[in-house]
Amino acid sequence: ATAAHELARRGRSVLLLDRAWRVKPCGGAVPPQLLTDFEVPESLLVARINEARMISPKGRNVDIPVGQGFVGMVDRDVFDEWLRARAAAAGAARRTGAFVRREHDADGVARVVYTDGRSRHGAEQSVRARFIIGADGALSQVARQCIPRADEGKFVFAYHEIVESPAYDSEAFAHDRCDVYYQSPLSPDFYAWIFPHGKTTSIGTGSLQKGFSLKGSVARLREATGLDQARTIRTEGAPIPLHPLPIWDDGKEVVLAGDAAGVVAPASGEGIFYAMTGGRLAADAVEAALATRSARALASARKRFMRAHGQVFWVLDIMQRFWYTDDDRRERFVAICRDEDVQRLTFDAYMRKRLVRAKPLSHVRIFFKNLAHLTGLATT
């Protein structure tokens, strides 16, 4: 929807093909930077998070204040529809359906074949397209059919239950606090969460481990926090990409964006900001390809994204690969997060969407604190 909006507002003829019948499974967190960069009204926020609580394997809590700012929470059904409507208002044609395959007409122009309507089993329709932006999720059919090495993507499998939020705050739940559990019974290699969304709350978990019971984990978490008494509204599951794909375009007419390109932050699973950023960069790449009449411009989407965010993804990937591997390391990871410099730099990076280079002494302190935990010189 972001890519469609960007191109439509520039006067391009755009078809937005979307599986509008499906609510995207998502924790729903957005940084204030997203509201600014993409002109999103604060009225779409259903909650403002002022604190994050990290719970270690031994049950030790670290409460991290957000500081100056907040983490916004959105409901994806409302938020995504607003994005689609904005694209349509800018001039994009909307159509509900699902991508089936790409074909080519006799003159070499691509033709997108899709199922029409609110089901994958609808009648097949087709439309000619000079360029195609594939933003059809982690298991993207556009990527699998059109992009080299798309099968190299790896995923965390996530599951959450949307429940009615408790009427009152308690030790186990607060309407303005996100809780993140680093405990192997809840996730052997990722984390479990409780994310308030105003009237509703997302309770979920993720894991790379096949056979791990995600539903069982959420049931245990709900029972431990008393949220098993809350009414369940719906349940959802979806894969979360672990790494950006190595190639985002086919060198001819297709470029990827969002989960289809693998742009979900390692360690945190944050994806909305990066999906919208990828959508804008894909639109820029298509605009450049149209202007220059060269499909080489499509490669600029990945180059620009990785130049802006690749370092953050690299750091988060290292963090996940090391600190999430067992409960001993996760206990130490949570202990490190008690450090005020770690807290401040983490949320500064989250808010601004870049690594913070200020206060070099803080980085030195954090480095030696990490080193102490890695070598076992520090105690938890």
Question: Where is each model-derived feature located?
Answer:
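Glycine-rich FAD pyrophosphate-binding loop
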Residues: 2-26
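C-terminal helical "tail/cap" subdomain of flavin- and related membrane-associated enzymes
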Residues: 287-380
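FAD/FMN-dependent oxidoreductases across multiple families
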Residues: 209-286
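A conserved beta-strand/loop capping segment in the N-terminal third of enzymes
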Residues: 33-86, 97, 102
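Predominantly flavin-linked oxidoreductase catalytic cores and closely associated redox partners
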Residues: 6, 86-231, 246, 262
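Generic enzyme active-site microenvironment
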Residues: 16, 134, 257
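Short, hinge-like loop/turn segments at secondary-structure boundaries
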Residues: 31-35, 151-152
